[in-house]
């Protein structure tokens, strides 16, 4: 049974991607999956899914969604309070 991983960000936090294709991009945390240590960040890591039509009257479509990132690939943005 996999253990839950400690994730140092919360929903609504501003984070910066520190590695990978989207390096140095910032976004807001939308969802956290502690079971596998992945988070979904708003506006980062878009993927496309091609959906076939299921009936004759329906048409196929391309759905765009934000894929999860591993929590070790992001860092928390700290705002300095004066």
UniProtKB/Swiss-Prot annotation:
Subcellular location, in the record's words? Answer: Plastid, Chloroplast
Cross-referenced InterPro entries, in alphabetical order?
KOW, Rib_uL2_dom2, Ribosomal_uL24, Ribosomal_uL24_CS, Ribosomal_uL24_KOW, Translation_prot_SH3-like_sf
**What's the domain of life for this entry?**
Eukaryota
The processes (GO biological process) annotated in the record are: translation
Q: Do you know which Pfam families this protein is assigned to?
A: KOW, ribosomal_L24
The UniProt keywords, alphabetically, are:
Chloroplast, Plastid, Ribonucleoprotein, Ribosomal protein, RNA-binding, rRNA-binding
Q: Which GO terms describe its cellular component?
A: chloroplast; ribonucleoprotein complex; ribosome
- Its Gene Ontology molecular function terms? rRNA binding; structural constituent of ribosome
What is the role of this chain?
One of two assembly initiator proteins, it binds directly to the 5'-end of the 23S rRNA, where it nucleates assembly of the 50S subunit.
What PANTHER family does this protein's entry cite?
MITOCHONDRIAL RIBOSOMAL PROTEIN L24
Q: How does it assemble?
A: Part of the 50S ribosomal subunit.
HAMAP family xref list: Ribosomal_uL24_B (MF_01326_B)
Q: What's the family?
A: Belongs to the universal ribosomal protein uL24 family.
Q: What is this protein called?
A: Large ribosomal subunit protein uL24c
What is the organism lineage in this UniProt record?
Eukaryota, Sar, Stramenopiles, Ochrophyta, Bacillariophyta
């Amino acid at each position: 049974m996999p253990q839950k991983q400690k994730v140092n960000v919360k929903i609504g936090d501003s984070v910066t991607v520190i590695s990978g294709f989207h390096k140095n991009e910032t976004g807001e945390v939308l969802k956290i999956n502690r079971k596998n240590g992945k988070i979904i960040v708003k506006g980062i890591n878009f993927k496309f899914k091609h959906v076939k039509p299921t009936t004759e009257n329906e048409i196929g479509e391309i759905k765009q969604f934000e894929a999860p990132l591993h929590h070790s690939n992001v860092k928390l943005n700290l705002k300095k309070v004066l």
